Amino acid sequence: MGRLLGFLLALGPWALVAGVVIRGPTISLVSDSLLAAGAVGANGSFLEDLEVPGELHFLGPQVPHVTYYDGSVELLHYPPDARCPRAVLVEEMTACPRRNAVAFTLCRS
């Protein structure tokens, strides 16, 4: 972690990355656009809010085995000065058809 922090600080407060895949246990965030990366504070959080544009995808074994699936997406904000995150967005989706790529598209609600 120390080397990463030193590298980010040496680059300056912002560096641009050309794309990223953040793979979770059931879904992944895929972004082909430029992402803002910032310096990390002493407590391990970013010093400023970062914008992470992208799409939710199913990769490999993450693709649901059923024809239609339900799910929810929660966007949480972790403020650096507070202990608890707060929900910025909560979306419930139902009857989403299984697709091998973008998740939560063509859902009924």
From Swiss-Prot:
Keyword annotations: Glycoprotein, Host cell junction, Host cell membrane, Host Golgi apparatus, Host membrane, Membrane, Phosphoprotein, Transmembrane, Viral envelope protein, Virion
Membrane topology listed for this record: Single-pass membrane protein; Single-pass type I membrane protein
Subcellular location as annotated: Virion membrane; Host cell membrane; Host cell junction; Host Golgi apparatus membrane
A GO term from the CC aspect: membrane
Glycosylation sites: 43
Any Pfam family matching the protein: Herpes_gI
InterPro entries tied to this protein: Herpes_gI
Assembly behavior: Interacts with gE.
Annotated family: Belongs to the alphaherpesvirinae glycoprotein I family.
Biological function: In epithelial cells, the heterodimer gE/gI is required for the cell-to-cell spread of the virus, by sorting nascent virions to cell junctions. Once the virus reaches the cell junctions, virus particles can spread to adjacent cells extremely rapidly through interactions with cellular receptors that accumulate at these junctions. Implicated in basolateral spread in polarized cells. In neuronal cells, gE/gI is essential for the anterograde spread of the infection throughout the host nervous system.
Name of the molecule in the record: Envelope glycoprotein I
Protein source organism: Cercopithecine herpesvirus 1
Gene name per UniProt: gI
